[in-house]
């Protein structure tokens, strides 16, 4: 947050205002990275190993998030009917995915991560460079559902999606198509 978001740590802000906050880095991101540093080659190697074991890095992250939400909801001082999640960028993807795959989450906000596969699977987009893109891939899911379809599973609950018009990772045409889905 030091270089982004005006230096405001969202979790700290919520905690200072009385909310219970659990902020978990995805495996191979932030504090759960490698001691020698995280790079795209290492992330791709991790993803490859998950696939060889019949799973995926993306599925692991999703289940890690579900277990984290279940833990928060189980705390005696937490109202399990008021558990929510919020995320920016990769965290936004994790937020809407988490809300879609567990009833533990009652409300979510996702800032700057929504698009369609058609607009992300281009030669110049970050999604095709490997590395961290594998953290969001669930084998065979795109065969049935695109990103906005998956996100819509969360939408019977209060759900906020917010995207910027100049986000270099998410072409505005794809954002508009996703919102029209």
Which functions belong to the PLM regions below?
Residues 25, 86, 111-112, 162:
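Alpha/beta-hydrolase-fold catalytic nucleophile elbow
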Residues 100-106:
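Conserved hydrolase catalytic core segment
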Residues 166-170:
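Acidic catalytic loop of the alpha/beta-hydrolase fold
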Residues 44-45, 49-53, 67, 106-151, ...:
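Mobile cap/lid helix-loop segments that gate and shape the active-site cleft of serine hydrolases
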Residues 77-89:
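Alpha/beta-hydrolase fold nucleophile elbow
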Residues 1-63, 68, 73, 119-122:
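Cap/lid segment of the alpha/beta-hydrolase catalytic domain
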Residues 87-97:
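Glycine-rich nucleophile elbow surrounding the catalytic serine of serine-hydrolase chemistry
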Residues 154, 161-163:
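Short beta-strand/loop motif that positions the catalytic acidic residue
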